Each structure stands twice: as structure tokens, then as C-alpha cells.
Amino acid sequence: MAIKLIVGLGNPGQEYMFTRHNAGFWFVLHLAQQFNITLAPDKKFHGVTGRGQIHGHDVRLLMPLTFMNKSGQSVVPMVKFYGIDNDELLIAHDELDIPAGSIKLKTDGGHGGHNGLRDITPHIGNDFHRLRVGIGHPGHKSKVSGHVLSKAAPDEQIAIDSALSAAFDALPLLLGGDVEKARSQINGFKLPE
């Protein structure tokens, strides 16, 4: 199946826009900009939504405005309203367990402690596609909140942006339904030495 809905998880508000936790938002914002898709507030879905053509495929975009730990309040109604099957759903989110500059495409699995996914999976299951954008782990769990809610250092941000570019390059495969080739291309990305 082809991807019909791309969700970018993050927190609303200018104070959070450039924090690591908003890596999913960055992905969707870049898509909207690159493919001239207008994003607008949509009260029905508690988020910012858009629809347009990406590499010849009709795709909806969503950025929940519910704060991360309430992402299900936005994602679930949109999935149900448009009849999006889980194999047609891609959720982009930050991932602590992957170093900055790495990116992974995964299907299935638990929430891995990610509060946005934790709020979504009880309602739709966990067999959807996830674009896991590495932001690195601060080392101790007591530092996680401060880490995800702060800006990446300039070298980390460059690494994250490079990883996101690798995902953009694989989009034609993913949108066309060739998930395995897209996964191989995305998961094989390595930062230049």
C-alpha cells in the first residue's frame, strides 16, 4: 500500500519549534515547503493539516497541536475519518535511542517510551510505519526531558538535517509502496566521515 498520511510529531508553539522533540514537525514542514502544500489549522483534527501531491501521490500531512503526550487526540480522528489503514500511515518522530545523524524506518513495534506513540498505539495498534529521527540520548534518564526540550548543538542539527534529507530521498519508494527498498535506503544512511 502507498502512504496516504504523513504525521510529524512535536509540540506546538514557537518556544518548542527548534527543540529536538520537534523532529517530526521538521519533516512535515519540509515536505509542505518542498511540494507547495499549504498547511492550515484544522479544529476537527486538533492540528495543522494539508493535502497535496508528493512525487505524484495524493498525500495528507498532519502536525498535531495537542502537545506530544496527547498526539492520539489528533492522529486517531484523522485516521478514522479518512479511513487510513495502518500500512498507509507514516509517523515521523524524534528517537532518543538513535544517535543524531541516524534515521530508521520501522514498521510495527512498541512505543519505546515515546509519549506521542504511547498515546496513539492503544487506539490504532502499532503496525504503522515510523520514521525514527535520531536525536541521541543524554546519558541518564533524569536528563531526557531537558534534552528533548532543548535545541540541538549546531553540529548535531546539521547531522539531523542530513538524516532527514536521506528520508526525503527515499520518499518516492515509500510513497509508491516499496517499503522494503525505502527501509534499506533510509536505514543504510551514514553521515559522511
Curated annotation (Swiss-Prot):
InterPro entries linked: Pept_tRNA_hydro, Pept_tRNA_hydro_CS, Pept_tRNA_hydro_sf
Cross-referenced PROSITE patterns: PEPT_TRNA_HYDROL_2
One Pfam family hit: Pept_tRNA_hydro
Top enzyme class: hydrolase
Site (Discriminates between blocked and unblocked aminoacyl-tRNA): 11
Cellular compartments per GO CC: cytoplasm
UniProt catalytic activity: an N-acyl-L-alpha-aminoacyl-tRNA + H2O = an N-acyl-L-amino acid + a tRNA + H(+)
Active site: 21
UniProt keyword terms in alphabetical order: Cytoplasm, Hydrolase, RNA-binding, tRNA-binding
Biological-process GO terms, alphabetical: protein quality control for misfolded or incompletely synthesized proteins; rescue of stalled ribosome
Gene3D superfamilies in UniProt: Peptidyl-tRNA hydrolase
Subcellular location: Cytoplasm
Function noted in UniProt: Hydrolyzes ribosome-free peptidyl-tRNAs (with 1 or more amino acids incorporated), which drop off the ribosome during protein synthesis, or as a result of ribosome stalling. Catalyzes the release of premature peptidyl moieties from peptidyl-tRNA molecules trapped in stalled 50S ribosomal subunits, and thus maintains levels of free tRNAs and 50S ribosomes.
Entries under HAMAP family matching the protein: Pept_tRNA_hydro_bact (MF_00083)
Family to which this protein belongs: Belongs to the PTH family.
Name of this chain's protein: Peptidyl-tRNA hydrolase
Organism of this sequence: Psychrobacter cryohalolentis (strain ATCC BAA-1226 / DSM 17306 / VKM B-2378 / K5)
Gene that encodes it: pth
